[in-house]
Amino acid sequence: MLLDLAKSRRTVRKFKSESFPVDKIIRCIEVAREAPSGINKQPWYFLIVKDPEKKREIRRRCEKFERDLHRRVRGELKEWMERENITWRKDFLEEAPYLVMIFSDIRAPYSRESTWLAVGYFLLALEEEGLSSLTYTPPPAREIAEVVNAPRYYRLETILPVGYPKEGGRKKRRKELQEIMDFDSF
């Protein structure tokens, strides 16, 4: 059932190096392409990266910007990042067997919103395939997109490292239903 998939899905930052057939990811993209989109433009593009050199370069570029970002962060955000053990290091960009880079075509109306709907479908499909991921939104999107020669009209929305989780873990607490909804008015 869909609710069970959603409840079991969690973010994973540490992956086993164990490979798996890329067909599993392709099936997930099949699911994602069924997502609704503004004016039915389907503005998403999924790029699967397996090449270790490309993964290394993507990581290098991401960490360069993340390091600077982490130096500048202050206050509550800094405290939260420390509490959650979120650092500038992005090992998962090389550890996961595959990276799935998801782009939106900026020439299409509602491209960003539509692409993120497809990302949601993709994440649930990964869960159904027994795979794990996290939604990493890289700060220097254009510079990262250059590694894979993405056309300028494609905006990198997220990079999803995909693989089997290295360790068990628990899903973080979700807000109660009454905290996130109402009828007719707030």
PLM feature spans:
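N-terminal amphipathic, basic helical "cap/leader" segment at the start of enzyme domains
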Residues: 1-94
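Short, basic/glycine-rich phosphate-binding loops at helix/coil junctions
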Residues: 5, 96-103
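Arginine/glycine-rich "motif VI" loop of SF2 helicases in the C-terminal RecA-like domain
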Residues: 38, 127-128, 152-153
